[in-house]
């Protein structure tokens, strides 16, 4: 089944989002969430490799109209890659301020979208589309393998991993920004992209990110200081 996520926004949306991202980084530094910030940057780079390198160059399924493809996809990847990975990492941290972080991110997304619609009439329109039929099966396989690893660990091991909690993070983070795009009119009014993307796209990485998080946080605190040896 072909699901084609599409977005339409103006150039002001990009610039406002860059301001939001800079503000987000400043807050992360101020609150000493250093590892979350580093993971966010790496997540943005990963998104760019996938979106530009695979979807655009290798498969030709990514289409950008009204902007330079390289720069636009670099911004999109760093924007949603950084924000998603930071948000997920803070959830995995079981950060005591998870609600505040979540509200900050969601309110920021909504604010950027609506401000750009109010004041961006003089900026050019940008449209992005992405076909999925050539790779959603591979994504589903990656998702299956990841959760299978956690399931096998639970079956064989003494320590029980909270798989429903990990699954909820993977689905809800993607659903949240898909919903913001939908209600602000940036995403076309279709239900399948939000359903399929929420179940697969961010969620496929959660088992692996959980294992990475657990390995790192055994040795380091969020501010990069060493944890005492157990």
Which residues make up each language-model segment?
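Aromatic-rich, lipid-facing transmembrane alpha helices and their immediate juxtamembrane interface loops
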Residues: 1-230
């Amino acid at each position: 089944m072909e699901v084609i996520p599409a977005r339409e926004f103006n150039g002001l949306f990009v610039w406002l989002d860059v301001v939001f991202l800079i503000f987000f980084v400043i807050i992360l530094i101020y609150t000493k969430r250093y590892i979350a910030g580093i993971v966010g940057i790496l997540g943005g780079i990963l998104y760019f490799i996938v979106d530009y390198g695979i979807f655009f160059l290798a498969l030709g399924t990514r289409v950008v109209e009204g902007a330079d493809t390289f720069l636009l996809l670099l911004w999109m990847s760093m924007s949603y890659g950084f924000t998603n990975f930071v948000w997920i990492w803070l959830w995995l941290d079981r950060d005591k301020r998870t609600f505040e972080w979540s509200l900050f991110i969601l309110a920021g997304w909504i604010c950027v979208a609506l401000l750009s619609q109010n004041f961006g009439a003089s900026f050019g329109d940008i449209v992005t589309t992405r076909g999925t039929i050539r790779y959603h099966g591979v994504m589903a396989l990656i998702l299956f393998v990841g959760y299978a690893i956690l399931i096998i660990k639970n079956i064989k091991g003494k320590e029980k991993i909270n798989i429903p909690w990990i699954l909820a993070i993977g689905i809800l983070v993607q659903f949240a920004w898909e919903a913001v795009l939908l209600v602000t009119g940036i995403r076309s009014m279709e239900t399948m992209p939000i359903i399929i993307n929420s179940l697969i796209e961010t969620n496929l990485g959660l088992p692996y990110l959980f294992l990475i998080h657990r390995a790192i946080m055994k040795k380091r605190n969020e501010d990069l200081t060493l944890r005492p040896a157990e």
